[in-house]
Amino acid sequence: MGGAQANLRRTMSMARRPFHEEPISRVAIWSSRLGWFAFAVAVLSIIIVRSGLLEIVPALATFAAALIFAGLAILLAFAAFVVIWRQGLGGLGRALLGLFLGLSLLAYPAYLGTRAMRLPAISDITTDTANPPRFEVLARLRPRGRTDYPGPAVAALQRAAYPDVVPLELDVPTKVAYDAALALVTKRKWNIVDTRPPTLGRRDGVIEAVARTPIMGFRDDVAIRVNPAGQGTRIDMRSASRFGTHDLGANASRIRSLLEDIDDAISSTPEPRSLPEKKALPAKKDQPEKRQPAKR
């Protein structure tokens, strides 16, 4: 009996022993921490740029710091994998989290880097390199020295990289084309700073607006010129970045997209149909007037 009680006490004491958690790799912990920190800094830098709280250069420096932290998170994640494998430590989930956050932040900048290597370092694109639309009202908003078109060297680079950026010619009156362009600019929620519709005294129509890039919200300036050409209309467009020497193809894409939408809008508008002419009814022959009997 006494032996049975002793065995029971030993069993209960073993059951009450504290459970020791598996030690976690500190490298994995720091990988996930740096990943989250990089993510927070990247989001903060985007908010700063879009809201205009800081100038472009400090905001971009903040975003670059986020990318550096993301790269460190990836390196620590791979180091954690080695430590976990060799020492049998825990923390695989945290290492994977740090790797995922780091790769997520670096994926889009890496894609932009490949575009920067393929495309020329230009940031002022127009459909008319000989006589580009002018920035008039926008000239007050652009940095000094970035108002005039760069010249023939940039035009040659543009023609080689974006041969499809050409004027849009339409078989419609100038006012119709201008209204279609203005409607699409408004639909895109660009900040319109000047509109000059074509009138009897001024044949050309002009639209000046500010567009923003989707993620960072950089401001790019847009000028649209609508003028008569023969029996129809010609639309020229210019899109230029305010900062930087490389737009990564953003301005050419903006021009291409808007002109295609204008063309589609004009093509889908039904032409007014003229009403069929009414045939003249044959004249009635004169008939002898019937005399009504006199009322009594």
Language-model segment annotations:
Residues 47-52, 82-94, 109-296:
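Ser/Thr-rich, low-complexity intrinsically disordered terminal regions
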Residues 2-43:
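Membrane-anchoring hydrophobic segments
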Residues 1-2, 231:
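Feature targets compositionally biased, intrinsically disordered low-complexity regions
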Residues 20-23, 77, 118, 161:
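Preference for short coil/turn "hinge" residues that link or interrupt alpha-helices
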Residues 26-84:
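Membrane-embedded alpha-helical segments of integral membrane proteins
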